[in-house]
């Protein structure tokens, strides 16, 4: 018997809402693929994807960042939020992989190499530097942040609220409190 076919229109809608909330309400991985929409520069040295164990791969936006302020160089940065172990795939888009270091080395993250990509698992939030072929300046800065537990709105008391997007110092409100 097809239970969905038996349900009335209103009940079908309620069932769909319940399924959606049960699926997204327990999300343990939050990605931010919308980087291109913010006007931030993209760095295509690497392609990064993450997934909950055995789940579907999700794209992560690779930001172009500046490092070494004495001799400015471009590097890559990605960020996502995790609340449970995740699998990470980092594909090197230019050249071959001879050597990989995932810093801090003391953490001892083990990785596997498959052609021009590495795979590893993160069991908790961490900030890492992934270096290919001894290149410390054109590395990938990976920020696996903890899931957000606090939420704020524009009307929250004693909070200077900045909504989603890119903000610069000129965006600060001029308050004389």
Language-model region placement:
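Bacterial N-terminal signal peptides that target proteins for export
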Residues: 1-14
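Generic detector of low-complexity/intrinsically disordered segments
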Residues: 9, 16-17, 142-144
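Extracellular/periplasmic carbohydrate-active domains that bind, remodel
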Residues: 28-177
């Amino acid at each position: 018997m097809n239970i969905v076919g038996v349900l009335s229109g209103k009940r079908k809608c309620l069932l769909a809402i319940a399924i959606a909330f049960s699926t997204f309400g327990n999300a343990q991985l939050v990605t931010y693929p919308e980087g291109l929409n913010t006007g931030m520069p993209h760095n295509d040295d690497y392609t990064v994807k993450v997934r909950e164990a055995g789940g579907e791969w999700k794209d992560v936006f690779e930001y172009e960042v500046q490092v070494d302020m004495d001799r400015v160089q471009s590097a890559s940065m990605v960020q996502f939020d995790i609340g449970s172990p995740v699998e990470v795939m980092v594909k090197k888009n230019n050249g071959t992989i001879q050597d990989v270091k995932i810093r801090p080395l003391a953490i001892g993250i083990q990785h596997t190499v498959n052609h021009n990509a590495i795979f590893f698992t993160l069991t908790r939030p961490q900030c890492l530097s992934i270096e290919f072929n001894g290149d410390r300046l054109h590395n990938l800065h990976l920020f696996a942040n903890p899931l957000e537990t606090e939420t704020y709105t524009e009307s929250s008391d004693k909070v200077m609220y900045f909504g989603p997007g890119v903000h610069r110092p000129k965006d600060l409100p001029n308050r004389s409190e």
